[in-house]
Curated annotation (Swiss-Prot):
Homodimer. Interacts with FtsZ. The keyword Cytoplasm applies. This is Cell division protein SepF. Keywords: Cell cycle, Cell division, Cytoplasm, Septation. It comes from Nocardia farcinica (strain IFM 10152). Belongs to the SepF family. Residues 25-36, 53-83 have a biased composition (Basic and acidic residues). GO terms for cellular component: cytoplasm.
């Protein structure tokens, strides 16, 4: 049978009996070789479906007889009473005797070392050192005076000395006002004087300081406009008479410079920025 015929026979397109002799047993002689047409074979003669396959020998009594499933295999001897005997000796577990009430905790169950009183020590207070009363500064033997509660050796500490040392460290250092370079010693304005007259009667003090050769800053902020104008006229005439200079530094603030002191515009600007005229 060709492959195409097998395919058609598989899907029922052609009868299977026409090609059964070639499909089932290739070793059997074909119908053309035997000299005639061959009819279909009985079902029992086909390969694999003979009487020997489903005969009595296959399901004989020897296979499923009482010898195989007899009482000896599944009888009471196998699952008898002697296997699960009630008199078997099993060890009985030991049980503690029951006592009514709550158990009292023993003191030994909670060791005292875990939360003892000496676990956290109280803060120690510094020992006060007091000098023992004595008539002299030193003892007769030339030794140091006796101290009450003093610690001797390398660990000796004087609390009073420590307090004085701490006070000196915390004491603020005096802040020295640093003047600009033009006001330092040796500078052109090192002898400068700032005057704040309250009225026109103090014009004499301004003239005396300027006549001594000292530069004078005249602050007229607190004066009225009338008195300030009179003092400005006085200072201008004074500077002209002594061949000095008269310059305005800020509003109502003027600088009188002697003849030997030359103040530049940069220095006047620095005087106004530093506010030196506000210092007494």
């Amino acid at each position: 049978m060709s492959t195409l015929h097998k395919f058609k026979a598989y899907f029922g397109m052609v009868p299977l009996e026409d090609y059964e002799d070639d499909y089932v047993d290739d070793r059997a002689p074909r119908a053309s070789e035997r000299g005639g047409a061959r009819g279909p074979r009985p079902y029992s003669e086909r390969a694999g479906y003979g009487a020997d396959r489903y005969g009595e020998d296959r399901y004989s009594a020897d296979r499923f007889g009482p010898e195989r499933f007899g009482a000896e295999r599944f009888g009471p001897d196998r699952f008898g009473a002697d296997r699960f005997d009630e008199d078997a000796d099993y060890p009985e577990p030991a049980y503690k005797s029951y006592k009514s009430g709550y158990p009292v905790a023993r003191r030994d169950d909670y060791p005292e070392d875990a939360y003892g009183e000496d676990r956290y020590e109280a803060p120690r207070r510094p020992t006060r050192i007091d000098a023992a009363p004595s008539s002299g500064r030193f003892r007769a033997g030339g030794g140091a005076p006796m101290l009450r509660g003093a610690t001797r050796g390398a660990l000796a500490v004087d609390p009073e000395a420590e307090e004085r040392r701490l006070e000196e460290r915390m004491r603020p250092e005096p802040v020295v006002a640093r003047r600009p370079g033009i006001f330092e010693d040796g500078g052109p304005l090192s002898k400068i004087t700032t005057l704040r007259p309250r009225d026109y009667s103090e014009a004499r003090i301004i003239g005396e300081r300027f006549r001594e050769g000292n530069p004078v800053i005249m602050d007229l902020v607190e004066l009225s406009n009338a008195d300030a104008k009179r003092l400005v006229d006085f200072a201008a005439g004074l500077a002209f008479a002594l061949r000095g200079s008269f310059d305005k530094v800020a509003t109502k603030v003027f600088l009188l410079s002697p003849a030997d002191v030359d103040v530049s515009a940069e220095e006047r600007r620095r005087i106004a920025e530093t506010g030196f005229y506000n210092q007494k």
